[in-house]
Amino acid sequence: ELVFVNDGSKDHTWEKILELKEERAHIKGVCFSRNFGKEGAVFAGIAQAEGDCIAVMDCDLQHPPETLIKMYRLWEDGYQVIEGVKASRGRESFIHKMFAKTFYSIISDATGIDMSRASDFKLMDRQAAEEFLKLPERNVFFRALSSWVGFKTTYVEFDVQEREAGESK
């Protein structure tokens, strides 16, 4: 099953998702009326997913799909949350890297969770996903909250790939 979330995109993303849904029964789509942000899109995708495990990844292919195989095998070994951690930040500007380092240092100090190489690229067991969805918070930081829920966790390094299309908003 694949769940695609269109977070208010102004290009033809939703039309493409609808085409894919017509061609393949295992594809689902969620379309937001406007851009609600990445966290809302992640919540919506997890809520729609029905599998025994759920992977969250960016559709711009900066999260390498081939890493999902390693994540899945770790899930089969009994891990409930498999965190994708950045081996490198890819080709970001110096100023972007500096601000990111400062931001994640503050978040790490506040939460007690090492966020220095964290990403939204994860695979979660159904149980972990259900507990995540039960949390009352709706203004969340998925990258940190998924580590906080307290399930058996491991990490997989990946190299951030060049963006295939689009840009961060």
Say what each PLM segment does.
Residues E1-S9, V30-C31:
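Short beta-strand/loop segment that forms part of the nucleotide-sugar
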Residues N6-E15, L61-Q62:
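A conserved acidic beta->alpha catalytic loop
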Residues E19, H26-R34, K38-Q48, C53, ...:
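Acceptor/aglycone-binding surface of glycosyltransferases and processive sugar-polymer synthases
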Residues E23-H26, K152:
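Glycine-centered tight turns that cap/initiate beta-strands
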Residues D60-L61, V160:
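Short glycine-rich anion-binding loops that position phosphate/pyrophosphate groups of nucleotides
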Residues L135, V149-V160:
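Structured inter-helical modules in multipass membrane proteins
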